[in-house]
Regions:
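Conserved GNAT-fold acetyl-CoA-binding loop/helix
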Residues: 29-51
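A short helix-loop-beta-strand connector motif used in the catalytic cores of GNAT acetyltransferases and
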Residues: 52-64
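A generic secondary-structure signal
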Residues: 51-52, 114
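Hydrophobic residues in alpha-helical segments
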Residues: 24-25, 34, 56-57
Length: 170
């Protein structure tokens, strides 16, 4: 189970629903640049947690993020293999009350270190919506360099946006 100084990455459990609803899922600002919608009710949060548990069970490198100090589930982080020796993040998200504490940096560095040390990755890639200045700054702060942009259509919102791609040699 990967961890950082302040965070534990573990598989979701059903009791996470309250923390996740309170800390991230109900916050529109957290979903603004992501490919997910907010969750508003307890019933929806329980159902979403059940889907998360099933998804994480089928994907070895997708985790719920827990703050060590409080024991609360505050977000998620994941990665997947793109090709031989190349791994990439599939999303990092933490609730707004936990932003500005260095947790994003810890998470992205944790993923890259885990990919290199445990999975033999030689390169790690990440991306963000071009309007997401915080994600761009995070990737640059963690030593990633810009590689290219891509226009992406988002079917739920019926919009096209620019995705910026970054990479880091490990």
């Amino acid at each position: 189970m990967p961890e950082t100084k302040d965070l534990i990455l573990r598989k979701a459990v059903l009791t996470d629903w309250q923390d996740m609803l309170r800390n991230i899922w109900s916050h529109a600002e957290s979903a603004k640049y992501m490919v997910w919608s907010t969750t508003e009710t307890e019933e929806a949060a329980i159902a979403r947690t059940e889907r998360t548990i099933a998804y994480q069970a089928a994907h070895d490198y997708h985790w719920t993020v827990v703050e060590k100090a409080s024991g609360q589930a505050i977000g998620w982080a994941g990665m997947e293999q793109h090709s031989d020796g190349v791994w990439g993040e599939t999303g990092i998200a933490i609730g707004p009350a936990f932003v500005g504490k260095g947790y994003g940096t810890q998470l992205l560095n944790c993923l890259t270190d885990y990919a290199r040390d445990q999975l033999g990755a030689k390169r790690f890639v990440a991306c963000c919506n071009s309007k997401n200045q915080a994600s761009r700054a995070l990737q640059l702060r963690c030593g990633f360099t810009f590689t290219h942009t891509e226009e992406v259509f988002h079917p739920r919102d019926q919009i096209t946006y620019t995705l910026e791609h970054y990479a880091k040699e490990l």
